[in-house]
């Protein structure tokens, strides 16, 4: 397998460009401002008991009475000690929220289009069109972060499926 440093350099610059686009679009986050996300405000109330327990006991509670009359906390941000995928996810989402989700949208769709053997210039345009599609921006505004997170990873999942069926185990 021959490594093409020019192509790697181009893709690296594109990824840097996507990070820059995400930061520029959400530039108020650089000043510490945050979007008022109604669902996140509601989450804060539901997760208060869990967060108080974590702070007081330095341990996790996997049950809360603060949501729906009692429920497991896995949907409210319970932390698990050996969740290495979460650590990888946090490394990929190095930008402040919500710019991190926009970056994931752009990166994931760019990779999908490259896997589909689309020219990188067209892939850039496709990624920008996908990332800035109306719905994907709207869900960030109301706090549907878990949905945005799942949608952002779907192009990468599809890329992996396509590569597996093509028996191409490396990009």
Predicted region positions:
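Juxtamembrane/transmembrane-helix boundary motifs in multi-pass membrane proteins
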Residues: 2-10, 89-97, 118, 142, ...
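Residue-level signature of transmembrane alpha-helical entry/exit and packing/kink sites
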Residues: 7-15, 98, 102, 123
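Membrane-interface coil-to-helix junctions
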Residues: 22-112, 128-155
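Membrane-water interface at transmembrane helix exits
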Residues: 26, 113-114, 162, 166
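Transmembrane-helix signature of polytopic, membrane-embedded enzymes
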Residues: 113-132, 170
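Membrane-interface transmembrane helices that cradle and orient dolichyl/undecaprenyl
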Residues: 157-171
């Amino acid at each position: 397998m021959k490594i093409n440093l020019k192509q790697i350099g181009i893709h690296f610059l594109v990824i840097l460009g996507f990070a820059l686009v995400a930061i520029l679009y959400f530039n108020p986050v650089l000043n510490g401002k945050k979007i008022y996300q109604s669902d996140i405000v509601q989450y804060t109330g539901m997760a208060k008991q869990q967060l108080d327990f974590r702070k007081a006991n330095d341990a996790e509670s996997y049950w809360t009475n603060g949501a729906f009359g009692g429920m497991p906390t896995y949907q409210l941000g319970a932390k698990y000690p050996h969740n290495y995928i979460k650590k990888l996810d946090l490394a990929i989402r190095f930008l402040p929220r919500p710019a991190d989700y926009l970056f994931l949208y752009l990166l994931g769709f760019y990779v999908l289009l490259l896997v589909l053997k689309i020219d990188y210039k067209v892939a850039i345009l496709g990624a920008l069109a996908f990332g800035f599609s109306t719905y994907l921006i709207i869900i960030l505004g109301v706090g549907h972060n878990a949905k945005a997170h799942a949608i952002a990873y779907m192009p990468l999942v599809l890329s992996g499926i396509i590569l597996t069926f093509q028996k191409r185990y490396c990009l």
